[in-house]
């Protein structure tokens, strides 16, 4: 039986990346870097809202794996996706969180991280 990843898993993954800070967005737990949004637990905690590169990337994720990634009219046209926590794998979750960090982190911080500093 698959165990659904939770916010604790999101925090553990995000702890790998420099500058990530816990915050609150719209009354729910969120993660930011340099004050910029990375992800947040949706009001309904079965989904995570995650920042992606652009709207085309969001659309590709939703079309490629509609059982995992979705949107609502509120998020349509925004560079992000909603992630169904009951079906996303930890590997997918880790990739999404790293990508969100890379989108928002400073280039020099990313370069230092990639260099193993």
Where are these regions (language model features)?
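Charge-dense, helix-prone N-terminal extensions
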Residues: 1-117
